[in-house]
Structures are given as C-alpha cells and as structure tokens.
C-alpha cells in the first residue's frame, strides 16, 4: 500500500471520520465500519484532505482540465484539492462548482468559478447511490464538456441492490474511471497489519464476503 493511503487512514481515524464498530447504514445494512467525511471540518483538516486527493491525482496520472466539486460536499473538497495541487505540485487548475438553486439575478446560472469546459475531474467524498454523479453529468454534458474521471475519498467496493456497486454502475454508464484515495482492500490490509484494529478483522471479512464486489 502506498504511504499516502496509510497516512490517510491514520488521519481519518484520528478525526473520527473513520470508525470501526457496528453501524446501521441508510440502506439498512449493518456495517462494521463507518466513514463520515463531514467531520473533516477545520482549516487544517481541509488543507490535509486536499493534499491526499492531490496525491491520488498524481498517482493516477489522470489527464484533466478543470476540477469540479458538486454541491454541497464537493465544494470545499474541490477548493482544497485545487489549492493542494498548486502548493504541493505547482499544478494550477481552474475550479468550478454548482449551486443547487438556479440564480436568476447577479451572475445568474448554476455554475460558479471556472467555466465547465474540456476534461472534467469530478471530486466528492463517496459515491453511495450515484445520484450526485448523474446530476453532475447533466451539467457536464450541457456544457459540451467531458468527464475525465471521478475521484472520491473512499470506495466501499460493495454491491448496491443488484450485483454491481454504485461505482461500477457509474463506470459502466459514463465510460469513466472512478478513482479513490483508499478502498475497502486498503482498509483490510491496514487492519490486518495493525494490532490496534485487528480485532475487527472477522466482521470486516464477513461483511466483504456478503456484500463485496
């Protein structure tokens, strides 16, 4: 596992963004872990978070023109990612985000920041049902732009209601890569190697066996 992945897991644990235990998800599933990126909520947290996204971008070598953060959670992520890309790697990319309510005065429209043009890197925290991605694709298509890739913090790698995960459905429907800072396999490897968390292994393995893709 790359060092930035291990560091990100440690960071998420230290902020209680990532927890092990027993949690009931919105789907009703009982999960042995929970991830809530909304708890990255200070200036220092967002600065570090942006650096982890930037590290994943560099590792993937994805080719893109604009960073797009869909409302609402994607807005601070997109901003912190674009700042981190410049500060850490000297890469200066435009950033764009949308408002969910179309504004009919002032600058109008539903996009703020850079025009949505060229190859778009969409950044968000997680993909649960893929709804935000589908809404974003309508915006991207309406602006004659192209989705280069999606980058999220965590890929749970678990099935939705069918045989595919929401992420696999997005990849199939939009012919794009979905990248992540970490995924379930990284989490499994981390707890296998860390005695602080190894007691959660049986539940994690059982969960992956039942719901994993």
UniProtKB/Swiss-Prot annotation:
EC nos: 2.4.2.10
Assembly information from the UniProt record: Homodimer.
Binding site for 5-phospho-alpha-D-ribose 1-diphosphate: 26, 72-73, 99-100, 103, 105, 124-132
The family this protein is said to belong to: Belongs to the purine/pyrimidine phosphoribosyltransferase family. PyrE subfamily.
Catalytic activity: orotidine 5'-phosphate + diphosphate = orotate + 5-phospho-alpha-D-ribose 1-diphosphate
Any GO molecular function: orotate phosphoribosyltransferase activity
GO biological process: 'de novo' pyrimidine nucleobase biosynthetic process; 'de novo' UMP biosynthetic process; pyrimidine nucleotide biosynthetic process; pyrimidine ribonucleoside biosynthetic process
NCBIfam families on file: pyrE
GO cellular component entries: cytoplasm
Role this protein plays: Catalyzes the transfer of a ribosyl phosphate group from 5-phosphoribose 1-diphosphate to orotate, leading to the formation of orotidine monophosphate (OMP).
InterPro entries: OPRT, Or_phspho_trans_dom, PRibTrfase_dom, PRTase-like
Pathway the protein contributes to: Pyrimidine metabolism; UMP biosynthesis via de novo pathway; UMP from orotate: step 1/2
HAMAP family for this protein: PyrE
Annotated residues for binding of orotate: 34-35, 128, 156
Name the UniProt record assigns to this protein: Orotate phosphoribosyltransferase
Entry keyword set: Glycosyltransferase, Magnesium, Pyrimidine biosynthesis, Transferase
Obligatory cofactor(s): Mg(2+)
Species assigned in the record: Haemophilus influenzae (strain ATCC 51907 / DSM 11121 / KW20 / Rd)
Main enzyme class: transferase
